[in-house]
Amino acid sequence: MDPLTHFDEKGGARMVDVSLKGDTRREAVARGRVLMHRDTFRRVRDGQIAKGDVLAVARLAGIMAAKRTSDLIPLCHPLSLTGVDLHFTLDELHSTVEIESRVKTTGKTGVEMEALTAVSVAALTIYDMCKAMDKNMVVSDIRLVEKTGGKSGHYIREE
């Protein structure tokens, strides 16, 4: 296992110095899900939630969150993202909204945290917009599924 890079020699937190690293194309994909009651799921699917189009708002929230990741996660570098996309899959059998984010940049450090943040905030937005009718929703399985670029190369999660 690689040493933890966010700590100095005395164990104090630090932001890693990436100034000597070269720019490379980087991409990360993350996924998560929101499980809900069947009636809630149908209302999300059919656009019948009082607060508005749940998936459209969640998509925008996820994109905005990816752009603000360094404001939320203390040791993340502020990045110039070149692309953020969120995709939703409606799983009617399990009353679940599956969320996938894809984040891209060309830079000195990866975009894994931005992809994970996008999924997390999109999921929380779905919860927020539907909580009046379903407080039993479950946000789960937020995970990195793929990353490319940088020193560690290409990673694909085995699912």
Swiss-Prot record:
Entry annotated with the keyword Lyase: yes
Name under which the protein is recorded: Cyclic pyranopterin monophosphate synthase
Function: Catalyzes the conversion of (8S)-3',8-cyclo-7,8-dihydroguanosine 5'-triphosphate to cyclic pyranopterin monophosphate (cPMP).
Lineage: Bacteria, Bacillati, Bacillota, Clostridia, Eubacteriales
Subunit structure: Homohexamer; trimer of dimers.
Catalytic activity entry: (8S)-3',8-cyclo-7,8-dihydroguanosine 5'-triphosphate = cyclic pyranopterin phosphate + diphosphate
Family classification: Belongs to the MoaC family.
Keyword terms: Lyase, Molybdenum cofactor biosynthesis
Pfam families: MoaC
PANTHER family assigned: CYCLIC PYRANOPTERIN MONOPHOSPHATE SYNTHASE, MOLYBDOPTERIN COFACTOR SYNTHESIS PROTEIN A
Gene transcribed to yield this protein: moaC
Superkingdom of origin organism: Bacteria
Entry's EC annotation: 4.6.1.17
Pathway note: Cofactor biosynthesis; molybdopterin biosynthesis
Keyword Lyase on entry: yes
Molecular function (Gene Ontology), one example: cyclic pyranopterin monophosphate synthase activity
Residues the record marks as active site: 128
GO BP terms, alphabetized: Mo-molybdopterin cofactor biosynthetic process
Broad enzyme group: lyase
UniProt: substrate binding residues: 75-77, 113-114
